[in-house]
From Swiss-Prot:
This is L-arabinose isomerase. Pathway: Carbohydrate degradation; L-arabinose degradation via L-ribulose; D-xylulose 5-phosphate from L-arabinose (bacterial route): step 1/3. Keywords: Arabinose catabolism, Carbohydrate metabolism, Isomerase, Manganese, Metal-binding. It comes from Geobacillus stearothermophilus (Bacillus stearothermophilus). The lineage of its organism: Bacteria, Bacillati, Bacillota, Bacilli, Bacillales. Homotetramer. Optimum pH is 7.5-8.0. One of its GO terms (molecular function) is manganese ion binding. Pfam families: AraA_central, AraA_N, Arabinose_Iso_C. It comes from the Bacteria.
């Protein structure tokens, strides 16, 4: 996985001076105990840092400004141990630019029935202190995540951890650079979009580079580096027999290794974490990048085919949310319309990430009927099984829309010996008919990011952080209600 900045999350506890210094001391001790205990749990991908118990408007505003200024702080987690009058929070929340999570918990799990007294009641007031704080968030329209439950509950911790990954993806988004090799596939609509608007909305820098720039990097790769990478291929993957001996198949694999090394060097030199290619712009290259793209995706790079820079950026961000696991560029390719067993076969010309593989990938070389170049090497495998999501980001002109479909990936019932690409089979929720109808009504693209590891909740959280629309298609979706949701959303987003 591509390395990330050493991010951290700030834990800030709200209180007030009404209860005396002894109570505030206990609030601080409890807060530190919670943070220390949470940091011992390996579920958390980044450390929590206890900042302070804040009791005045000045303290609150100061910590929010400090969070904004910190490159390490990826988000702020707030909790009201006692009652904390929420007018004190207005100045700070007006300034805060980092993702905000409101943890509605309390230090003790159970009521101490035999010993509870008013001292206990005055100290442990989260039940109404967090409601006061929640009101000001609603009154101000603050984008925030609310997680409810005892801090020792594994489900609460899991939700916190996933939100952390999403907040880090949002932080990465603000500095994300996409390299476009060539332009979009000609005459295609959905892969187009407002790159200036995307930089304003998400922080993405999206720029194009001539194929000649990449070709020079490929030519500069040493044969020693190519041979070392070929040795790595032989350790990680099955290889067709012809690819293990000198000849045209071996040379095709060698060329993909050269492309991988050159492409990676270009991306590293420019600090790019996502990129696009297109089969219509390959002048000077021997092959369309296939195996090379698959392996770079497995390292955490975002990718989009046919110049699809929005999906490339989305794949990168979902890779961050997923910690690099089980996430790939994808395309709805063809349908299986057997009554009662409708499924979608997802694939692409070459570029499906091996992190979603159920079987050991196999390097194969086959002709590619488009692009007019030599036969490219690629990894071929069947995808895994389990609950997953497909996500698409589209540009509607006046706003971006994120569309999420929950799906269930299934094991293929039949072999596909003549299909020379990586593939995965899934059943969309609530059904192929209703999901496809809703997807088309929403304008969802044919390119998506498929993930076993990212959840709908994470994608909704990201949309909230980024200030964009998000619609979800799942087992509860009815097309008639979904159509109304799209109409209501149109009014809401045009009015913002």
């Amino acid at each position: 996985m591509l390395s990330l900045r050493p991010y951290e999350f700030w834990f800030v506890t709200g209180s007030q001076h009404l209860y005396g210094e002894e109570a505030l001391k206990q609030v601080e001790e409890h807060s530190m105990m919670i943070v220390n205990e949470l940091n011992q749990d390996s579920v958390f991908p980044f450390p929590l840092v206890f900042k302070s118990v804040v009791t005045t408007p000045e303290e609150i505003r100061r910590v929010c400004l400090e969070a904004n200024a910190s490159e390490q702080c990826a988000g702020v987690i707030t909790w009201m141990h006692t009652f904390s009058p929420a007018k004190m929070w207005i100045g700070g929340l007006l300034e805060l630019r980092k993702p905000l999570l409101h943890l509605h918990t309390q230090f003790n799990r159970d009521i101490p029935w035999d010993s509870i007294d008013m001292d206990f009641m005055n100290l442990n007031q989260s039940a109404h202190g967090d409601r006061e704080y929640g009101f000001i968030g609603a009154r101000m329209g603050v984008a925030r995540k609310v997680v409810v439950g005892h801090w020792e509950d594994p489900e609460v911790r899991e939700r916190l951890a996933k939100w952390m990954r999403t907040a880090v993806a949002f932080a990465e988004s603000r500095n994300l650079k996409v390299a476009r090799f060539g332009d979009n596939m000609r005459e295609v609509a959905v892969t187009e979009g407002d790159k200036v608007g995307a930089q304003i909305q998400f922080g993405w820098s999206v720029n194009g580079y001539g194929i000649g720039d990449l070709v020079q990097y490929i030519r500069d790769v040493s044969e020693q580096k190519v041979n070392e990478l070929l040795d790595e291929y032989e350790e990680l993957y099955d290889i067709v027999p012809a690819g293990r001996q000198e000849g045209p198949v071996r040379e095709s694999i060698r060329e993909q290794a050269r492309i991988e090394l050159g492409l990676k060097a270009f991306l590293q030199d420019g600090n790019f974490t996502a990129f696009t290619t297109t089969f219509e712009d390959l002048h000077g290259m021997k092959q369309l990048p296939g195996l090379a793209v698959q392996r770079l995706m497995a390292e955490g790079y975002g990718f989009g085919g046919e110049g699809d820079w929005k999906t490339a950026a989305l794949v990168r961000l979902m890779k961050v949310m997923a910690d690099g696991k089980g996430t790939s560029f994808m395309e709805d390719y063809t349908y299986h319309l057997e009554p009662g067993n409708e499924m979608i076969l997802g694939a692409h010309m070459l570029e499906v990430c091996p992190t979603i593989a159920a079987t050991r990938p196999r390097i194969e070389v086959h002709p590619l009927s488009i692009g007019g170049k030599e036969d490219p090497a690629r990894l071929v495998f069947d995808g895994g099984e389990g609950a997953a999501v497909n996500a698409s980001l589209i540009d509607l002109g006046h706003r971006f829309r994120l569309i999420v479909n929950e799906v269930d990936a299934v094991k293929p019932e039949h072999d596909m010996p003549k299909l020379p690409v990586a593939r995965i089979l899934w059943k969309p929720r609530p059904s192929l008919r209703d999901s496809a109808e809703a997807w088309i009504l929403a304008g969802g693209a044919h390119h998506t990011c498929f993930s076993f590891a990212v959840t709908t909740e994470q994608l909704q959280d990201f949309a909230e952080m980024a200030g964009i629309e998000c619609v979800v298609i799942n087992e509860h979706t009815s097309v008639s209600s979904f159509k109304n949701e799209l109409k209501w959303n149109e009014v809401f987003w045009r009015g913002r």
